[in-house]
Swiss-Prot record:
<keyword id="KW-0822">Tryptophan biosynthesis</keyword>
<keyword id="KW-0057">Aromatic amino acid biosynthesis</keyword>
<dbReference type="InterPro" id="IPR013785">
    <property type="entry name" value="Aldolase_TIM"/>
</dbReference>
<protein>
    <recommendedName>
        <fullName>N-(5'-phosphoribosyl)anthranilate isomerase</fullName>
        <ecNumber>5.3.1.24</ecNumber>
    </recommendedName>
</protein>
<dbReference type="Pfam" id="PF00697">
    <property type="entry name" value="PRAI"/>
</dbReference>
<dbReference type="InterPro" id="IPR044643">
    <property type="entry name" value="TrpF_fam"/>
</dbReference>
<dbReference type="GO" id="GO:0000162">
    <property type="term" value="P:L-tryptophan biosynthetic process"/>
</dbReference>
<dbReference type="InterPro" id="IPR011060">
    <property type="entry name" value="RibuloseP-bd_barrel"/>
</dbReference>
<keyword id="KW-0413">Isomerase</keyword>
<comment type="pathway">
    <text>Amino-acid biosynthesis; L-tryptophan biosynthesis; L-tryptophan from chorismate: step 3/5.</text>
</comment>
<keyword id="KW-0028">Amino-acid biosynthesis</keyword>
<dbReference type="GO" id="GO:0004640">
    <property type="term" value="F:phosphoribosylanthranilate isomerase activity"/>
</dbReference>
<dbReference type="InterPro" id="IPR001240">
    <property type="entry name" value="PRAI_dom"/>
</dbReference>
<comment type="similarity">
    <text>Belongs to the TrpF family.</text>
</comment>
Length: 210
């Protein structure tokens, strides 16, 4: 199982997380997010992440110029799109930056299968998150059984996942590749090493299927 920890805002937290066997660390570049980081800040934070961990920049409906600024000024190797980005736009990114991974976040709603089919083949990974009227993480969960119909597609489960409820998700025997956490590894808005370690022990312990 893969683990992505997201929404980092301090070198201290990045360094602590990087000592754990996780697969990706995310930084949010979206001004309406409480975890927003400037490109300069992301450059500094990403430089503290070792090369074996993917460095993800989360954006909402960015233009190509913004993506160019992120990729040319930081060590980011994955772009995570949280808006209504078009297939043409994604293809444009891929054409210009063939080595960059692209992740697409989708809401776990009645249109999930339709939206997966729309983006399938154009992105490297899906993040399936709690439906929300605004973009970005809510810290709220959803009915995970909606994911039972999703097979043969690489995706991570996001949305209020923490060490208390992750076992419930595991018992559903879904086809997900792992989890994406932000608020579930925080205390008072800061990443918490005990919470991060607890999640790692659950997900990367005897259930690691990589």
């Amino acid at each position: 199982m893969k683990l992505k920890f997201c929404g980092f805002t301090s070198i201290k937290d990045v360094t602590a997380a990087s000592q754990l066997p996780i697969d990706a660390i995310g930084f949010i570049h979206y001004e309406k997010s409480k975890r927003h980081q400037t490109i300069t800040q992301i450059k500094k934070l990403a430089s503290a992440v070792p090369n074996h961990i993917d460095k993800v920049c989360v954006m909402v409906n960015p233009d190509l110029t913004t993506i160019e600024h992120v990729l040319s000024n930081t060590s980011i190797n994955t772009i995570q799109l949280h808006g209504t980005e078009s297939i043409d736009f994604i293809q444009e990114i891929k054409k210009k930056y063939s080595s960059i991974k692209i992740t697409k976040a989708l809401a776990a709603d009645e249109n999930i299968i339709q939206n997966i089919n729309k983006y399938k083949g154009f992105v490297d990974l899906f993040i399936i998150d709690t439906p929300s009227v605004s973009y970005g993480g809510t810290g709220q969960t959803y009915d995970w059984t909606i994911l039972k119909h999703i097979k043969d597609i690489p995706y991570l489960i996001a949305g209020g996942i923490n060490s208390e409820n992750i076992q419930t998700v595991n018992q559903l025997k879904l086809s997900h590749q792992g989890y994406d956490l932000a608020s579930g590894i925080e205390v008072n808005g800061r990443k918490d090493i005990e919470k991060m370690t607890a999640i790692v022990n659950i997900v990367k312990g005897d259930r690691d299927n990589e």
